[in-house]
A protein has these predicted regions:
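Covalent nucleotidyltransferase
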Residues: 1-274
Length: 274
């Protein structure tokens, strides 16, 4: 079905262990803003539709199978407009709060989304991308006046189905998703062939399949492995340590992939990384 962005307000979303962090760059963020702004000005169609948000029902939240990047970017746009345009909490203007994003293995990211501190942005790769996206949003809005900001926000958060609204394709897998393995399989299939996912991130998803663990310790082991994976990645992102262990000229979006290349005996190529 289709949902207005306004319909997502007040919801709680949970990003499971098999997913990597936020990785959109400034170009992708600004392209989304341009598209929404173009729709705001022209409104040649009844609604502007984002790519699917794929979810399953959790206990008190929606588990995100696919669409984390889009959900996070919209969150950051609304966070900026709340702070710099409305200058008051969204709940005061719209009687409902901004939706919440929680992470199974990176709970500190939930707090960082509230502060978006420049000082902390170099602490890990997730903060780096989140802060970069927020700065791109600030830059994009820098030449917009109050009325233009208001138009943009009114379009983004249009309430009724009769208004020109921004919508997402909402795909609820709850009835089909008997276990975590099915969600991981869907996640992998949806992302094969997409630029954002690296080989290492697909390997991570496969490692965390429920069938790899005994039933009594499945969740504990999944969380432990996902946490250790993130710790390794953060260590590899430290410039001094990275240059100590490698002299490769190849650029890795996720540096743990270098370890897999070593294990496989993969020779370096000079193809550009995209």
């Amino acid at each position: 079905c289709l949902k207005n962005i306004h319909d997502l307000l007040g919801m709680s979303f949970y990003v499971p262990a098999y997913q990597r962090g936020y990785r959109w760059g400034a170009g992708q963020v600004k392209a989304l803003l341009d598209d929404i702004w173009d729709f705001t000005l022209n409104k040649s169609t009844t609604f502007y539709c984002l790519q699917p948000i794929v979810v399953t029902r959790g206990n008190n939240s929606w588990l995100v199978v696919d669409g984390q990047q889009r959900l996070t970017t919209i969150f950051l746009i609304l966070k900026f407009l709340e702070h710099d345009h409305l200058r008051r909490p969204l709940v005061e203007a719209y009687q409902v709060s901004l939706y919440q994003l929680d992470y199974e293995t990176r709970p500190e990211c939930t707090d960082y989304l509230l502060s978006l501190s420049e000082e902390q942005s170099s602490e890990n790769i997730d903060y780096f991308y989140l802060f970069g996206a927020y700065q791109a949003i600030k830059e994009w809005f820098s030449d917009k006046n109050y009325n233009e900001n208001n138009k943009f926000l009114d379009t983004l958060l249009a309430k009724s189905n009769t208004e020109n609204a921004v919508k997402v394709i909402w795909y609820d897998l709850s009835d089909e998703c008997a276990d975590n393995d099915y969600a991981i399989d869907v996640f992998s299939r949806l992302n094969i062939g997409k630029i954002p996912l690296t080989n290492a991130e697909l390997v991570r998803a496969l490692f965390l399949q429920k069938s790899n663990f005994k039933h009594h310790d499945t969740r504990l082991k999944q969380i432990q492995i996902a946490h250790e994976w993130d710790v390794i990645e953060q260590r590899l992102q430290e410039p001094a340590f990275w240059h100590f262990i490698t002299n490769t000229s190849k650029k890795y979006a996720t540096r743990i992939e270098y370890i897999f290349d070593l294990m496989k005996g993969k020779k370096e190529t000079y193809e550009a990384f995209y």
